A protein has these predicted regions:
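Short, well-ordered secondary-structure micro-motifs
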Residues: 2-4, 26-27, 47-50, 76-78, ...
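A generic structural signal for alpha->beta connector loops
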Residues: 32-34, 61, 109, 135
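Residue-level detector of beta-strand structural context in well-folded domains
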Residues: 54-55, 101, 126
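Active-site neighborhood of phospho(di)ester-bond hydrolases with catalytic His/Asp-centered motifs
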Residues: 12-18, 36-41, 65-68, 92-97, ...
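Active-site-proximal segments of metal-dependent phosphoesterases and phosphodiesterases across multiple
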Residues: 46-88
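Binuclear metal-dependent phosphoesterase catalytic core
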Residues: 3, 7, 86-89, 106-107, ...
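Core catalytic region of metal-dependent phosphoesterases/phosphodiesterases
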Residues: 1-59
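Active-site environment of divalent metal-dependent phosphoester hydrolases
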Residues: 20-24, 42-47, 72-77, 93-106, ...
């Protein structure tokens, strides 16, 4: 994740769980960048300390629905994830859990982004660009793309 932050130089970082401590470490290493995060199913201790499994915030002027995804059963279907994101007025539904990168736009304009995993499973991150409160692009950067940016 550190390499991705150095390569992309984002205005904000979203960490979608498992290994909640990694998000806290990134926040300490890059104190000038706002880090938003949710715990994953492997962060059960964090959930017991009342860290919400779902958050919906305005990040860089864009309302984002953020969850790890295990409680939305994203390995089976995205239906519940999309329904909840729409109900909260989000412009994007961000999730993890599957470790499979996914970036697409629904017919109604809702962006859906799973960054994959930037850790030991190969390396990918999601990049979302915003302007004036709108998402202008979203994509997955895989490890070779990140290497080119360094």
């Amino acid at each position: 994740m550190r390499r991705a932050v150095n390569a992309v130089k984002p205005q904000a970082i979203v960490h979608l769980g498992d290994h909640f401590d990694d998000g806290e470490t990134v926040a300490q290493e890059f104190p000038h960048i706002r880090v938003h995060q949710v715990p994953g199913n492997c962060d059960a201790w964090r959930m017991m300390r009342y860290e919400p499994a779902v958050k919906c915030y305005d990040v860089c002027g864009v309302r984002l629905f953020m969850t790890h995804g295990h409680e939305h059963h994203v390995k089976q279907t995205l239906m519940r994830l999309l329904q909840d994101a729409r109900a909260m007025g989000a412009k994007a539904a961000l999730y993890g859990h599957t470790h499979l990168a996914d970036c697409h736009r629904e017919e109604d304009g809702l962006w859906v982004l799973n960054p994959g995993a930037c850790g030991s499973t190969g390396g990918s991150v999601g990049l979302m660009e915003t302007e004036k409160g709108e998402i202008i692009s979203a994509r997955i950067l895989k490890n070779p793309d990140l290497e080119e940016m360094l």
